[in-house]
Amino acid sequence: GTENKTKVEDIINLERYEYFDYDLYPDYQNSIGFSQRGCRLACKFCVVPKKEGKNKGNSAINGIWRGDPYPKNIVLLDNDFFGQPNWQEKAKEMIEGKFKINFSQGINIRLIDEESCEMLPQINYRCSKFKNKRIYTAWDNLGDEKIFMKGVERLTKYGVPTSHLMVYMLVGFKKAETMEDILYRFNKLKDLKCLPYPMVYDRNNKELKKFARWVIQRHYKFIEWEDFSQENRNKFYRDQKGSEDQMDLFHNNCVVSALSETGDT
């Protein structure tokens, strides 16, 4: 979402720079890098196409790995892995090299095809902590419902369960978007058994920030949105006849449940 189009290469006046200063984080064990740059899409809220251009290949997977004694955990910064010309070779590297891959920037589910879906379950894809199986993707626009659902259908056809999908939901970008529109997307994702994750575009919108909190901390498993909203929240707890301590315990249980379930935070 940032409007900053400056690249490291622009600052140091090099055509390409792919080195990461791990010395800043001496205890960090994973390997970080790009196997590709750019994106096939041109979303209005995203700077990637302007900053990185069209999709092109970058480093090999073995080139990203820091080597022994570091674990074969790769944090990919790719914005469109399956859009690069030689993604099959890099997927083969992942599989044959027995790497764990965190697709940290997600995959483009709207553009995913049969070949990509067939290959993906063979890759050991993981969450950011490399504990749970996780694929990150997005459903940012209500109008993309059909193509999003088609992508989900393709993934499940080839063995990626919906419970492995964390789906980012951009909220607050479209001025005409209503809370009903947002809840429609959320409920669809919940019914699919995906993990919804709202991304609030307008950080000044308190209601949307509250909605994000309700979803991300998995309060929705215990409280309806109407009850969680600020004007009704206190009334809800009073109706439950809960003391202040019980309210705190209830909140903590929600958070613990969310964290233990996802393994992503």
Give the role of each language-model region.
Residues G1-E3, P49-G151, T162-G172, L195-M199:
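Core AdoMet radical
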Residues G1-I32:
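Glycine-rich beta-alpha loop elements in corrinoid/cobalamin-binding modules
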Residues G159-V160, L170-T265:
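Auxiliary Fe-S-binding modules of radical SAM enzymes
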Residues K5-E9, L41-F45, E52-N55, G83-P85, ...:
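Short catalytic/ligand-binding loop motif for oxyanion handling, primarily in non-cytosolic enzymes
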Residues E93, R154-K157, K188:
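Alpha-helical scaffold elements within enzyme catalytic domains, especially in hydrolases
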Residues D27-W65:
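Canonical Radical SAM [4Fe-4S] cluster-binding loop centered on the CxxxCxxC motif
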Residues R40, D68, K129, K157-G159, ...:
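Alpha-helix termination/capping residues and helix-transition junctions
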Residues C43, A91-K92, F186:
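Non-transmembrane alpha-helical segments in soluble domains
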